[in-house]
UniProtKB/Swiss-Prot annotation:
A motif ('HIGH' region) lies at residues 15-25. Belongs to the class-I aminoacyl-tRNA synthetase family. MetG type 1 subfamily. It comes from Pasteurella multocida (strain Pm70). PANTHER family: METHIONINE--TRNA LIGASE, METHIONINE--TRNA LIGASE, CYTOPLASMIC. It catalyses: tRNA(Met) + L-methionine + ATP = L-methionyl-tRNA(Met) + AMP + diphosphate. Its EC number is 6.1.1.10. Binds 1 zinc ion per subunit. This is Methionine--tRNA ligase. Its cofactor is Zn(2+). The keyword ATP-binding applies.
Length: 682
């Protein structure tokens, strides 16, 4: 048990109110919930909060597309998100929204304090403006040709093909993603948060030793490259909070989003009588932890603590970042049926299965977690059903049938029970350090010992022999005592299953009760705590996800056909001479190997045979070919004399030709039978 109760405030990153919760989101919420449940079992006062991130251009545009107000869209999203989290037994004390009176008041208050303290600057900037929609375009709402490698259909902030970063104004032939119009440059006054002013404070913070090493190392890289002032304003039209003392300026979503943590807690305080300042004042003794994904470390380790410090508020005790979820070793994919929504999963499987699997693979490092669907079935059946649940089922029946549900008055194997209970300190340390995989391994090792005890004693043999009733009761009672200890250890991970165990044991399983075995105690008849997984259940989830994707594509194509003119043929480029064409050395190449680049949303890595040598080429066709291995063995056309380009993932030694508008609409060029690797295209 803990020496004294701690006051702890825990948050998860705020899901964006513009889409469904999927299994990638759930990794973080399950991870945090397990940690919170453990802390509560140890007697600490934990307040677990979250909210929907409900502002920004994407929400405004999607609402317009759906013909509803942004308020209606975010209300619908919040209801869906709350239902999904409740379905997975995420034990939030409060789930709020950034589009709330509390958040609006806190955001304005903090902005005014930062401004008064000299940390808000203003200057005029030039931005791309959509003349048809009458709006400034965020980076991700502009597409065009990369100014570095000339790859088409690239976003306004970075190129997925060559990994270059640039400003939207550098794009060649830019176009608005919103309307398709050619944007124009327009000046506007913007407000900036003076992040460089906090460099000294942030450097001292990372030296405190409380942050994950990966985060501290990454922050050091950012310091070396130089901190920049942060644009915290957006121009109308924009769905968000208006900046005080302005007519048409709004807070950038990432300014008010983290303040949403405070707003959700303020909402909880108003409902329960908690003291808000006790948790947020500069000298607060309460602990504050943020569970986040690795993609938003920048905001939580730089901007957020700097904003808090600039307002004379406390900084987080720690920021816990995790990696992404992959499925079967690759990025989640809608077309493959692995981009699984929470609601789809819950229609087919119990939430405890995913909670257990994630826990079994989680550690305290920033590593991606692979959900291997075949391993998922095997592990759940082997661990939860065969080892844990079966330990109770093979013992409880004898107690209820032969002894009126009464456990023995004494412990048959005191030393064995003591061995199980003594593991509590180590398991508690693993929980505290978020080493959930180690918790699961430790518990399953104990489960193996408990099942070996049953196998060695063979109560089914005792039950057939006269005069061994007392021994039978003692052995089966001992097995249930061991099961009870394991159930206490697993309660933060699989609370729903353990609730059923508590019902049949007629005992509330607490960490404190580890040293209080159930002696001469009555139990109820055993009922199945968990069902075996059938691979067909996984197939059903995957198939339903694929069907959702097909239906979504059909709807988008239907809407696109209504909105777009019939002709989508690109105009012919300027005339070139035969000499210009002759400069290109086009060759036929055979695909020897093709694989996805995990760090990129668009790139595939090809190993090509050009007859007398092999080459590595990266191509941005990942969306069009989501099963790269199927390309192996086919022929493609390559620009062979293109200068090699060094990329973040390696050197690309050519360019593979394809036709189409980009994204999923790309098609590799085929060659007739009889061609050989290295043949020149003329």
């Amino acid at each position: 048990m803990a020496n004294s109760a701690r006051d702890i405030l825990v948050t998860c990153a705020l899901p964006y109110a513009n889409g469904a919760i999927h299994l990638g989101h759930l990794l973080e919420h399950i991870q945090a919930d397990i940690w919170v449940r453990f802390q509560r079992m140890r007697g600490h006062k934990v307040h677990f909060i979250c909210a929907d991130d409900a502002h920004g251009t994407p929400i405004m545009l999607n609402a317009d597309k759906l013909g509803i107000t942004p308020e209606a869209l975010i209300a619908r999203s919040k209801a869906d998100h709350v239902a999904d989290f409740e379905g997975f037994n995420i034990s939030y004390d409060n789930y709020h929204s950034t589009h709330s009176p509390e958040n609006e008041a806190l955001t304005a208050e903090m902005y005014k304090k930062l401004r008064a303290n000299g940390f808000i600057k203003s200057r005029t900037i030039s931005q791309l403006f959509d003349p048809e929609k009458g709006m400034f375009l965020p980076d991700r709402f502009v597409k065009g040709t990369c100014p570095k490698c000339k790859a088409e259909d690239q976003y306004g902030d970075n190129c997925e093909v060559c990994s270059s970063t640039y400003s939207p104004t550098e794009l060649i032939n830019p176009r608005s993603v919103v309307s398709g119009a050619t944007p124009v440059l327009k000046e506007s006054e913007h407000f900036f948060f003076d992040l460089p002013a906090f460099e000294g404070m942030l450097k001292a913070w990372i030296k405190s030793g409380s942050l994950q090493p990966e985060i501290a190392n990454k922050m050091q890289e950012w310091f070396e490259s130089g901190l920049q002032q942060w644009d915290i304003s957006r121009d109308a039209p924009y769905f968000g909070f208006k900046i005080p003392d302005t007519e048409d300026k709004y807070f950038y979503v990432w300014l008010d989003a983290p303040i949403g943590y405070m707003a959700s807690f303020k909402n909880l305080c108003d409902k329960t009588g908690l003291n808000f300042d006790d948790f947020w004042k500069k000298d607060s003794s309460a602990e504050l932890y943020h569970f986040i994904g690795k993609d938003i470390v920048y905001f939580h380790s730089l901007f957020w603590p700097a904003m808090l410090d600039g307002c004379d508020l406390r900084k987080p005790t720690n920021v816990f970042a995790h990696g992404y979820v992959t499925v079967n070793g690759v990025k989640m994919s809608k077309s493959r049926g692995t981009f699984i929504q929470a609601s789809t999963y819950l229609r087919h499987l119990a939430p405890e299965y995913l909670r257990y699997y994630y826990a079994a693979k989680l550690n305290n490092r920033i590593e991606d977690l692979d959900l291997n669907l075949e391993d998922f079935v095997q592990r759940l059946n082997a661990d939860v059903v065969n080892k844990f649940v079966n330990l109770a089922s093979r013992s409880a029946g004898f107690i209820t049938k032969r002894f009126d549900g009464k456990l023995s008055a004494e412990i048959a194997e005191p030393e064995l029970l003591a061995e199980f209970v003594e593991k509590a300190a180590q398991i508690a340390t693993y929980y505290e350090e978020r080493e959930f995989g180690k918790v699961v391994r430790e518990v399953m090792q104990l489960a193996d010992k408990a099942n070996k005890y049953i196998d060695d004693k063979a109560p089914w043999v005792m039950a057939k022999e006269e005069g061994r009733e007392a021994e039978l009761q003692a052995v089966c009672s001992m097995a249930l005592q061991l099961f009870r200890v394991l159930a206490i250890y697993l309660k933060p991970v699989i609370p729903q299953i353990i609730a059923r165990a508590e019902a049949f044991l007629q005992d509330e399983l607490t960490w404190e009760s580890l040293n209080r075995p159930l002696l001469n105690h009555a139990i109820l008849p055993f009922k199945a705590l968990a069902q075996r997984l059938d691979p067909k259940q996984i197939e059903a989830i995957v198939n339903e996800t694929k069907e959702q994707f097909v239906a979504q594509q059909a709807l988008e194509q239907k809407n696109s056909a209504k909105a777009e003119p019939a002709s989508q043929v690109e105009p012919i480029a300027e005339t070139i001479s035969i000499e210009d064409f002759a400069k290109l050395d086009l060759r036929v190449a055979k695909v020897m190997k093709c694989e996805a680049v995990p760090e990129s949303n668009k790139l595939l890595r090809f190993e090509l045979d050009l007859g007398d040598h092999t080459r590595q080429v990266f191509s941005g066709i990942k969306e069009a070919y989501n099963n790269p291995a199927e390309l192996e063995g086919r022929f493609v056309v390559v620009i062979a004399n293109l200068a090699p380009r060094k990329m973040r993932f390696g050197v690309s030694e050519g360019m593979i030709l394809s036709a189409g508008t980009g994204g999923a609409d790309l098609f590799l060029l085929n060659a007739d039978q009889g061609v050989k690797p290295g043949m020149q295209v003329k």
